[in-house]
Amino acid sequence: MKTLYSLRRSYPVETLFNGTIALAGRDQETTGFAWWAGNARLINLSGKLLGAHVAHAGLIVFWAGAMNLFEVAHFVPEKPMYEQGLILLPHLATLGWGVGPGGEIVDTFPYFVSGVLHLISSAVLGFGGIYHALIGPETLEESFPFFGYVWKDRNKMTTILGIHLILLGVGAFLPVLKALYFGGVYDTWAPGGGDVRKITNPTLNPSAIFGYLLKSPFGGEGWIVSVDNLEDVIGGHVWLGSICIFGGIWHILTKPFAWARRAFVWSGEAYLSYSLAALSLFGFIACCFVWFNNTVYPSEFYGPTGPEASQAQAFTFLVRDQRLGASVGSAQGPTGLGKYLMRSPTGEIIFGGETMRFWDLRAPWLEPLRGPNGLDLSKLKKDIQPWQERRSAEYMTHAPLGSLNSVGGVATEINAVNYVSPRSWLSTSHFVLGFFFFVGHLWHAGRARAAAAGFEKGIDRDFEPVLSMTPLN
């Protein structure tokens, strides 16, 4: 049997179950990787690796288009989106497509168009992926030197980084254009229960935008997740887009400084580990955003946040009992604290009962009833609107609690409905994926550093027990 290792190897060698599966330049003997090691076989075949990446993009866009059309086909306009297990249509509605006052869906045609556009795009990407995987040149360096690269070429790598940053910057400006010029976006804080509006005055003050980055991530601070108005959201996209574009130009025009050349490992697997770390961070941030934030993820589409559902319950029963003659300002609960209203540690009037721990919740249906010192007793008596009652009653019964078998609500609730909040699905999935990507980062970073240090040489195959065994095939 041919020896499949050398002392200078920096990758593990796997043994094929069936030695007959072989493709030139992609078999185990020439690459050191078995078929199931995927793109590792293509590390030095830039043309084939391009095919794998383009095909992967095609799969992603195909999922988006197919799932989009699936949600459109199943959508019932009479029910809220969050009752229907939808995760893509809420994003489109948040961008202001097909939605009217109060978050009511008035037109599903834009959603259909979005799905079809993604399907068509996926066909183009799929064709490109298959072409480059099977027909196009194995390596790009000879025929198309602009697209060719060597992993160790630090200058070329930072040029590629710069191109990616410019593309990301352009992407960050797309929601800005939508909000400013193309019909606006959905604002859950618009008076009367939310509406689509153009953002005419985005926040460009750097102290306001970068102030979010300097806030604590804990408690009432909430880092960037605490953003509560669309002016700051769109202004943040302007800043991020600009930074990405200028940073991209910088990386294209410059070579890495000496400290950067020393600090980083310059290999394909190292770049993979850096990317996985970034994606892991994105996943954790997205998890917190969709769980806590009801401005970027409006409750009309995603369902209430946990604190919002809890406060909605207190509000709903305050409204009911006030109608029945209860004095909500002075009634005491079983603990001697206020039954409906009490004071927060800093003196504001807040809802009493178990929901006191969520006293700092801000929600569009509740804010009109506040005064300078928290909830305003006279507003609670005279100013509650029917839409506020309807919305809080709806949110009260749709808390983002739920088990895998889709029995939603509090575990002890006898009238539980078949409901799990999209907030639960999206935050849980992004947390789990963020964690797995972090583990992948550690794995690939460790291997890349070991390879760079020259001490990952693999198992010495001369003493490998499997060599004395009968081949499986």
Curated annotation (Swiss-Prot):
The modification Phosphothreonine is found at residue 15. Residues 1-14 form a propeptide. It is a multi-pass membrane protein. GO terms for biological process: photosynthetic electron transport in photosystem II. Binds multiple chlorophylls and provides some of the ligands for the Ca-4Mn-5O cluster of the oxygen-evolving complex. It may also provide a ligand for a Cl- that is required for oxygen evolution. PSII binds additional chlorophylls, carotenoids and specific lipids. Gene3D superfamilies: photosystem ii from thermosynechococcus elongatus. NCBIfam families: psbC. Belongs to the PsbB/PsbC family. PsbC subfamily. One of the components of the core complex of photosystem II (PSII). It binds chlorophyll and helps catalyze the primary light-induced photochemical processes of PSII. PSII is a light-driven water:plastoquinone oxidoreductase, using light energy to abstract electrons from H(2)O, generating O(2) and a proton gradient subsequently used for ATP formation. This is Photosystem II CP43 reaction center protein.
